[in-house]
Every structure is written in C-alpha cells, then in structure tokens.
Amino acid sequence: MIWYLREVSGMFRFMLFGFLFSSLVLLGSIPDIDYDYFENDKFDLVDIDEFLGRVNVKNILRGRYFFIGIRNVANPSAVQALSKEKLDEIREINPVGIILFRENFKDAQQTKELIEEIKRHLGSDILIAVDEEGGLVSRASENKKLGVYNFPAMESVGKTGDFQLAYKIGEILGKQLRRLGINVNMAPVADAKFATNNPLGSRTFGSSSYNIGLMVEAFIDGIQREGVFAVVKHFPGLGGTKVDTHKDLALLPYSKNFLMVNNFIPFLFGKKAKFIMLGHVLVPKISADVSSMSKDIVDIIRHNLNIFSIIMTDAYDMGAIVNNFSLEHAIKKSLNSGIDIVLIPEGFKKLNVEE
C-alpha cells in the first residue's frame, strides 16, 4: 500500500473531495453520459511496482522511436474512423504510440472502436495517449460524451495542499481513460512556476518544488495504479521561462545548482512515471543544445538524478522547433543524444529521417 494512504484523515479528506465534486457539479463540469455503455469495474487493480517492472523499456520500444498523431481539425470525421489505407500508412511509420486529440473523439463508443481498430492493425502493444492534465489542457474530458471527468486546473489542486486529492484525481482519470483504451496520459505537469508572467498559467501545481513533488508523486501513483502510464513533464522545467514554447524557444538562464534546488525536485518525486518529457528550452549554463536535443540534459536525468523513465520530447510541431530547426535535423539530434522517443503530432510523413 502506498505510504500516504495510511496517513489520510478520513473525514477531512472525504469532505474535501466531496466539496471538489460538488463544485464541479455546480459548474456543470461533470459530463452527462451513458454509464451503461461501460463495462462494470471488473478489471483488476494493478500493483504499481509489479506492473511497471513487467512492462519494461525494451518491451515498449522494440526499436521504435516515434509517437505520432492522426490529425484533421478541418474534418474531424476523417480521423474518427480510419481506412485500411491510412492504417497501412501508419504501420509503415512503425510508431511506438499514437496521441489522440479532440478531433479524434466523437463519443465513448466511437473512441473505443477507433482504438480497438488501431490495435488490431498496428499491434496490441501500441501505446494510445492523450493530454488530460485537468483545466485548459483536457483533450478527452472536454468532450462530455467520453465519460471522463473534467477536473479543474492543477493549480487549484495544489493550493489545497492535499496530495491525497491528487492521488484520487489520478486514480479516477486512470480508470476512465483505461475504459476507453487509452494507456498513456501526458501528465502530470511537474514544472515549478517562479517566473513573472510564466506561460504555464494554471497548469502547474504551484511554485514550491517540494509541494509540487508530493502532488506529482501522488497523481502518478493514482493513475498508474489503474494501468495508465504517466508522463511527467517538462524537464528541465518551464516554470522559470517567459516564452510559450508552442510559439518559440524558451530560455532558462540559470545554473545547474539553481535548477537542482528549484526545478528538478518534482521530477525526482515523479521518477516512478514510465515516461519523462523534455521541454523545448535552452539552458546555456548546462548545454549549448536545446533540452529536447541535449545529451547533457539526458546525462543529468540518467546519472545525476538516477531517473530511468523512458525519455521523450515535447511535440515537434511546436513553434520552438519549427521556427528554429528543420524537423529532420531536430529528430536526428534528439535520437543521437540518447532520447528514446520523439513526439510528432503532425507532419511525420513529410520527413526523411533516415541516416
């Protein structure tokens, strides 16, 4: 049993969690769905240590290096059910996983059928991911027909100081995502926010590295207990930046020692996450390369912090990459630095990444 479950003050936690759900109901955030569609809760609870040990890095990767998206914002129906030709095209890419976006979702049954078709064609071990952080970045729960609770932004959860609440949110999300066939959640955000006008906004648990670490650890334990892998992000931390990496490259003008104290602690707490995501940030006092292409950053993760999660990049269709590098160069640089997976939501088939 996870240690902090033994230290819960039962009535207080119950009241606090009940208050959260009451607030969500009043705000209309809990989706109106047909729960009869879902099977009863008959899947086994998963022992986290046994589960993560059994599903090891080599079994996940098997020589595959790319996580890709199947996108069509202008015509969502085109990516809510896939033709054999499209599936064959994806199979030629041989991705380790598929990340789904809002246009891939119509309702719960369609989503489950889409994922089952992907697995039939690409293999049952293909990873299926979504960004479900809570708050603004909630690709699944923003569709009320999917049966995923639309939790508030993690900043509000962090303010409660209640890491058992973070555990419960992770647990519920894990159960609901797994019912759909999703087995990876690109969360939690482990960045400690300390820069003025930081673009992360309410996505992070707050500014205290230690408190964020407790929240991150709890969320990861909760979601992975239900058989959904967590992705702790965005190492080395975006909380000290002032540029949104969706738009351009961010800068962290701090020393390694400063970041060890202010940025890295939450990632140490989150080391049980199956994946760790690198942000598109330049840290000139550590490396001349962008973090998502940097061997120096990989070495810090592996050798200084002793984190052995699978290392993946943030999305390579973001402004930080496309405005500054060719995708072919960025991908080769990342893989040569020791990064395990490159995330490419759009545009993969246009690339030539062969050596």
Where are these regions (language model features)?
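N-terminal hydrophobic targeting/anchoring segments and the immediately downstream early-domain regions
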Residues: 30-128, 132-144
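Glycine-rich, aromatic-flanked loop segments that form ligand/cofactor-binding clefts
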Residues: 121-149, 169-192, 212, 220-236
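Second-shell residues forming the walls of enzyme active-site clefts
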Residues: 77-78, 82, 107-121, 126, ...
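Hydrophobic faces of well-ordered beta-strands that scaffold small-molecule active sites
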Residues: 64-70, 96-100, 128-132, 184-188, ...
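Classical Sec-dependent N-terminal signal peptides that target proteins to the secretory pathway
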Residues: 7, 12-29
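A charged helix-plus-loop insertion that forms the helical arch/lid used to bind
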Residues: 146-161, 206
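Glycine-rich anion/phosphate-binding loops
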Residues: 106-111, 158-172, 210-214, 260
